[in-house]
Amino acid sequence: MKEKTKKPRYRLGQNMLWMLRQAHAAHRDDVPVFAVIKALAMSGTGISGLLLAPEIVRCVEEGAGFSRILATIAVLAGVLLVCSAVSAYLEHAPMFARVDVRLALIRKIHYKTCVMSYPLSEDPEVLKLQEQAVRATINNRCASEALWVDEQKFLTAALSFVVYLLLLTNTSVWLLAALTVTTAAEYFVNRRINEWGYRHRDEAAALEKKMDYVSDKARSTVLGKDIRIFGMRPWLEAVYDKTLRAIDAFVERRERVYFWTNVIDAVLTAVRNGLAYYFLLRQTLAGGMGAGDFLLCFSAVGAYTEQLNGILTELGTLRRQSLELCTLREFLELPEPFRMEGGKSLPECADGKYELRLENVSFRYPGAEADTLHGIDLTVHPGERLAVVGLNGAGKTTLVKLLCGFYDPTEGRVLLNGEDIREFNRQEYYTLFTAVFQKFSVLEATLEENVAQTREGIDEARVRECLEKAGLTERVAALPDDLKTHIGREVFEDGVLLSGGEMQRLMLARALYKNAPILLLDEPTAALDPIAENDIYQKYAAMTVGRTSVFISHRLASTRFCDRILLIDGGVIAEQGSHEELLARGGKYAGLFEVQSKYYREEGENDGRE
């Protein structure tokens, strides 16, 4: 099967200019200057060292006096010493300047990751591209830093090559032609191997991602109990070994390609050197040059071959690094699907109440074969408490993502006060919502910072009030440093680990602290028992009177207090109405409610017998 190729978006020259702009933006214009100076110094070192012995022989051959020989030695040795000293100094001096440029790119990657739109953050192709971008900036040997070193090596080889070419102009034109043909062949071989690596970068990234995931889960302190209780170690080891074997197979395949490339390179180099020595010796035996010229040309042929190989090698390396920089640039330049800048301002509402309407909305995830939601017509009235219920996978969370503006519908429109939300600045639109999702993130920071989501201007009294409403007052009182206690142990050794239920209560406190006009709860209490869930939902019912609220749950009893309940089934609104109205109809909602009620009654009876 023919492999699908992916043409690089940028050429080598374009990426070099881009890196120059990055160095300038990082206030490190000295990086390219260092590279040029070192290239000149290293070229001077090689050329002066090559000329030293032939010039002495030429002086002796011409019968020059001792003073001339001594002066020749002094000049060439002096140039050699100065160039060597400059080269040695510049071997390490520019390192921190190159690191500064790379760190600036790392900051850009992190910023892009933090601010890119939600659809991009869930797109597998974007996540692969992100990993490749990180790989291009991960250490001192990566493309974004090593490029400067290899540019310097290429300049060194190119400058030296020109000098040695001029020295060999007195030799046979057939010699130069032979060198050109063999080196051109070597160039195309190296180009093919670089393109092979670029074509298989996605495969390598996928294997690396899988290995990182398995390793991360195996080291997780949060999952440590589950791994031990359920005896998951052999399974994790088996998955790790399987992934490692897949990586080994890929590396073996890659190294096999590299091996045969190196074999071809070696053959071409041997042919090139053999032809060079053949033409040079034939000209010498014919009496076309003296002893000094012979020694000079003899040395120049070896240096010429070495620098020609250097040009080809560095050109291949630069091309490979350019391909890695292409992935970095592609990630940083990913277009945003939303209006994150510009766009219309939100409509002003004195009472802070907004109407949300879904107009014939359908949504299909990228790569999916069927719609998750289809033909949804829904109006969330200002101040309404709306519940969305249904079985797992019915599309409840997707509906919330559309309301929040995390996704745009595949068909139809989402309207805010009658205007399409795609016309608004999406960052401003997000300020209308405070949400708690089933999957959440807790920062490695203090408790109060996790609630307030900031380090400055924290209202401590308000933080305590929100924690109390979320039912965490007693837990906070037991913490060693009260609100200053660190959460998590990945960064802080003195951090505490909260239980799953406590984490979700913390998320509720965070939502209360933001106090946005619209509240969305996407099954945040799923880890709690039904009684605890009902208790928290009842608290929210009391706290959100007159405030637009959307509650998502698969436990129908927890949302009875809502003004209206939607039952999502198969991606459509199957039923809607109040709890009492839906029970009276005797439809799907009533059936699900009866099944769940029966389950909890039986569970309660069993607990009582125990």
Predicted regions span which residues?
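Membrane-integrated ABC transporters
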Residues: 1-46, 61, 66-71, 90, ...
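Cytosolic ends of transmembrane helices, especially the final helix of ABC transmembrane type-1 domains
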Residues: 232, 276, 295-333
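ABC ATPase nucleotide-binding domain helical subdomain, centered on the C-loop/LSGGQ "ABC signature"
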Residues: 413-415, 430, 448-493, 537-538, ...
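C-terminal portion of ABC ATPase nucleotide-binding domains
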Residues: 482, 538, 546, 555-610
